[in-house]
From Swiss-Prot:
Biological role: Catalyzes the condensation of pantoate with beta-alanine in an ATP-dependent reaction via a pantoyl-adenylate intermediate.
Organismal lineage: Bacteria, Bacillati, Actinomycetota, Actinomycetes, Mycobacteriales
Gene: panC
Subunit relationships: Homodimer.
Enzyme Commission number: 6.3.2.1
Amino acids binding ATP: 44-51, 161-164, 190, 198-201
Gene3D superfamilies: HUPs, Pantoate-beta-alanine ligase, C-terminal domain
Reaction equations catalysed: (R)-pantoate + beta-alanine + ATP = (R)-pantothenate + AMP + diphosphate + H(+)
Predominant cellular place of this UniProt entry's protein: cytoplasm
Pfam families: Pantoate_ligase (PF02569)
Name of this protein: Pantothenate synthetase
One MF annotation (Gene Ontology) recorded for this entry: ATP binding
Cystine pairings recorded for this chain: none
Species per Swiss-Prot/TrEMBL record: Nocardia farcinica (strain IFM 10152)
Active site: 51
NCBIfam families in the cross-refs: cyt_tran_rel, panC
Amino acid sequence: MIDPTLRGAYRPGQLTVHHDPAVLGSVAKALRGVGRTVALVPTMGALHQGHLQIVRQAKRTNQVVIVSIFVNPLQFGAGEDLDKYPRTLDADVELLRAEGVELVFAPNAEQMYPDGPRTTVHPGPLGAELEGASRPTHFAGMLTVVAKLLQIARPHQAFFGEKDYQQLTLIRQMVRDLNFDVRIVAVPTVRESDGLALSSRNRYLDAAQRETALALSAALSAGAHAGGLGAEGVLAAARAVLDATPGLDLDYLELRSSTLGPAPASGNARLLVAAKVGTTRLIDNIAVTLGAPIDGHPNLDSQPEPAGTDPALLPPAR
């Protein structure tokens, strides 16, 4: 039984919103104390079907799911869209209620950083590459808030989408390097029927810009299908699509290993792209298998495991 002093702070089958980190932490601790497993889905709100798919995957593991909604000022640099970032808490809560979520954590900046951002997490060299090259403070801010959320909720598992693949990779790195007692679960990118990756920033695109944005997923798909041609073939196939698309301001197109080191000669790799369409910056990525037998069929020995067989989807014993 949960501590009577927390009565009303957690109501099975009903959604409760908490703003105070101490209260949310106490509720999560009490749930763990009675043998419940806890899952965390961190978000910045403005929820869409991509977020909800992550929530659904978390719920399928039969855990108490905590969804955090916090627009983290630390991960926005000078001239970025912190003030413009959509804040739709009431609508987000209703979406989560419909998904059967029981706990929402929605603090403000003063509650998360009562003394300001005095202590932060440095992302290491990878934090200065790809997204970090143009957003030098972004990943330190992101890792700092994720570290705080993990400390507050102490979840058994935390769920993140693969769309922000560099973010996912850095979170895994932080958890491993700093010995966080949590399992990170990756959820595949959710796409529209035409291939566009779901993003809170898609709402900034007009109809013509949205059509232009489709080149990102088309380029990634072309690159992935050229895996048998090696790294140069993958990049050439993807770049041909991007170069043929007017109105696209390419930031980077890179092929890396699955941990974002140098791309291997064969096996699992990741193709990543970032570009501006109008004033909206979009990112996307896709898994690529490099190398194929002479007959052109994919090398099945180097294929990644299907997401459904990921042992991380099984609640850990604690």
